[in-house]
Amino acid sequence: MLTLEIITPDAKVYSSQADGVEIPTESGEIGVRTTHIPLVTKLVAGELKVSKDGSVESIAVDYGFVKVLGDTLSVLTEAAINVSDIDLGEVESAQARAEEALKKAELEGTDPAEVERLSSSVRYLIAQKLAKGRSRRA
């Protein structure tokens, strides 16, 4: 079994044993099982899937980093939420507001760091919607 920890700047939001984990990375989705080679890679906004005892739990994650060492998988991310806790209406509303703020910032020549922050927010909200949509079909 793997020990999985998901940590945000605010708290450790998830800690559990898992048979395997599917992780969204810059180079595509990777699967981690026990005895995986040591790895550090960049995490992208998307759906992280935790397999345990024959079931799969989905967690929407923002960008960050992943470290695999031995049978421990550490995910350091700006934000994470269990798909079962996502309110789709709230996410769609937040996405519309974030996209509007992003358009305004780009038109006004806002500081590039602020534009990237807004763009990241939009990506994370899209990841939540996609993850929630997949979980309802499963």
Residue ranges: model-predicted function:
Residues S84-A138:
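Acidic/glycine-rich phosphate/pyrophosphate-binding loops and surrounding catalytic core
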Residues E5-E99:
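Compact, glycine-rich, soluble single-domain proteins
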Residues M1-T3, R134:
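N-terminal export/targeting signal detector
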